[in-house]
Structures are given as structure tokens and as C-alpha cells.
Amino acid sequence: MSFRSIVRDVRDSFGSLSRRSFEVRISGLPGLSGHHRGKSLGSLSELRDRPVVVDQSRWVGLPPELLRDVMKRLEEGESNWPSRKDVVACAAVCRTWREICKDIVQSPEICGKLTFPVSLKQPGPRDGLIQCFIKRDKSKLTYYLYLCLSPAVLSENGKFLLAAKRNRRATSTEYIISVDSKNISRSSNGYVGKMRSNFLGTKFVVYDTQPPYNAGSLMSCQHGSRRISSRRVSPKLPTGSYPIAHVKYELNVLGTRGPRRMQCTMHSIPASAVDPEGVVPGQPEQLLPGPFEESFRSTNTSSRFSFMDRSLDFSSSRFSEISGSANQQGEDDIPEAKERPLVLRNKVPRWHEQLQCWCLNFRGRVTVASVKNFQLIAAASSESSQLEQQQQQQQQNHASSSSSASDHGKVILQFGKVGKDMFTMDYRYPLSAFQAFAICLTSFDTKLACE
């Protein structure tokens, strides 16, 4: 049997296995099987105690040494979508296969690939950009983020990643972000965060359902926030709403004729993350929180989630435990909580005399002039400048100082128009796809005070 035949057989058998598992679980629920006989629903303890007999795939008992070799070949061979779905299918066969995939499939920061759902909230690659594009639907006030599969952005469908829906309110505008393209709402199981603006459209706050490394300090600084115990909230709904970023647009005296000036304060990313040896702490292990993931997890590969199944988030810890431990530790107990957040600013464009417009070098990724186009780089702080002066005075290694300066000058996020309701979005470390998408959504909002 060929290698690809093995992969197809594993994927097909896994799909039929998950369907049988789902039918067994549904038939065991009183009131849903049609034989409740007037009785009320049983307790969750009774439901968990009931054994579920499911047929196992014949590939579950594959020797670990052979399985690891198969996974390595699959990881190297199926490096791009849509063929990369075979890696996702193999990771969902059983716990043994999943653990091996966790060891072989690296994070986007290292490999530069988006494989599992949790990759959407992990930092991008340090070397190079992950190229994406955004489709806007003005009639439905929705925005869809896709992963570029080829250089032809206008003619490809891409790999769906995230969706956002704009909700207008009396004093603000809210963008709901979800991994479910068909049900974009806070009540959806695919809800991963939101972005809210003020009335003038000059200030924005990005909220995440996942707790960052400094969740305790963020929630304590949030004005009027109320902490709700995760045990008192429905476990199927996300309980966290952490303000991880603030985006501010400054007044533009030239109006629509001049470039926008924006500043992004990333509270979930320390300023030291852009240093050569810097890291982004507190990276999530799962995309969607779910305390009942072991009892109600559906392993169907044809899930209604448009990106990938939530059962492949690779986490054994519950969201309530993570958030609880973050809230129990005070700001004094966490040294990282006092570290300065990363600040991003837009790269200043230059005026082109012949074209009579402001220009930025997007390296062919942006083709239509628009006030929405921007490039973000790390802002130079006073402390980092003093540190560089001290390094020069002490005559330290010139290579390390030049490397640090180059890292601060790299474009971390760029966004621009390429056609009608079509925009490109390219991001890199230390931003994640979710953070980059939320920042780009601020450019779509109407800015009464800036234009």
C-alpha cells in the first residue's frame, strides 16, 4: 500500500469513526433519542458515567517509531493547503497520534505555516511574512480573512481563517471575530474575540477570549470590569474578555489627502519581544475554550467550522483553570506584568512628486492607492535608545547592536487595497493572525475626527 493510500485510509476511517461516535453519544441523551418517556434530563455525572463503545481505527496500534517516520514524511510532503489537511486528519486519530504531531509540527514562529486552529493566536514567523488577504462584503457588513495559496490574490479562493461582522451601536461600533463564517456572533461556539471603537472612530480596543500572560493586571486596570467566575457561566460560551490591544488614530490636518497616523499598544506582547532573543510569553495551547471538551468533543473532520475542527486545538487544560491561575497571581507576583507593552506605529510614507501621492514600498502586494493602506513597525522607545547609547559607549559587539536595530525597523504588519473590496494583509512575529486581523479592521471603520 502506498504512503498516500495509507493517509487517505486513515482520514476516511477517522471520518466514519467520528460519525458513529456522535450517533452513540446523541442516542444516549434522554429527550433527544425519542424514548424519554416523560422523564427529565439526567445529570451530567450520569451522562459521563455511561460507557461509550466506539470502533477504533486499524491504524491506532501502529508502532510509534514507524508512526513518527510517517508523520515526518507527511509534514515534509504536505506543506501547503489544501493537501495539508491530511496532517490535521492524522493528528485527530487518537491521543498517541496527536502527541506525535505536537512534537513534529512546529509553531508558525518556527515553520511559518498555519496548520491547526491554535496557530491563529500564535505569533507569526520571525523570518518572512505570512501572506493573507481580506474580502469585504459591504451589504452584510462582514469581512473574511483568507490565507494566500498563490500569488494571484484576485483569482484565488484561499484558505479561510477568520471572519468578522460589524455591528453599529449608538455610541460605538463593534466587530465580532469568529472562526465560523456562517455564524458570526458572540453566542457562537466559534467566537474568539472582538474589536470595539469609540463614537469618533479614533480609538479602538481589541478583546481576546484567551487570557494573556499578564491577564491579572489587564483585568484589574480595566475600568468598570466585573470578574465572573467561570463556574457560574455556561461552559459552552467563552467567559474571558481581555483587552489585549489599543489602537489610536491621530488627527490628520490634511484630511483624506494625507496619510493616516496610527499607534498600536499591544498589552499582551512585551516590548522586549522584538529583540533578537525576545519571546512572546503566555502563548495559548488551544483556540476555543471548552471545559466539556472530553465529554462533548466531536471529532468529525467535516465540522461546521470553516477553518478546522475545534477538537484539534491540542490542549488538556481547561480554560477555567488557566484563567483562574492567572487571576490568583497578583501583579506583584508576576514580574512580566510590569514590563512595558510593545508599541507599533505606522511607517511614514514619502511624497511622490510625479504621481502626486503618498507612497510606501509594499513590494507589489498593494496595487491601489487608498487612505486605508499602512505599514506598522516597532516604535523606538526612550529606554531602548538609552540602552543603545550605553552599548555604543561600552563598545560592545557591533553585529548584535545592528541586528537589534534592524529588527525594530522591520515591517511587522502591512495592509493595503488590491481591488474592489479586496485587501492584502501580511504579518510576522510577534503578531498573530487574530491580532493582525483585528488591527486591520480598524482601518475600515469611519473616522469622523481624522478625515
From Swiss-Prot:
It comes from Oryza sativa subsp. japonica (Rice). Belongs to the TUB family. It comes from the Eukaryota. Residues 57-112 form the F-box domain. It holds the Pfam family Tub. InterPro entries: F-box-like_dom_sf, F-box_dom, Tubby-like_C, Tubby_C, Tubby_C_CS. PANTHER family: TUBBY-LIKE F-BOX PROTEIN 1, TUBBY-RELATED. This is Tubby-like F-box protein 12. Ubiquitous. Residues 387-406 have a biased composition (Low complexity). Residues 387-407 are annotated as: Disordered.
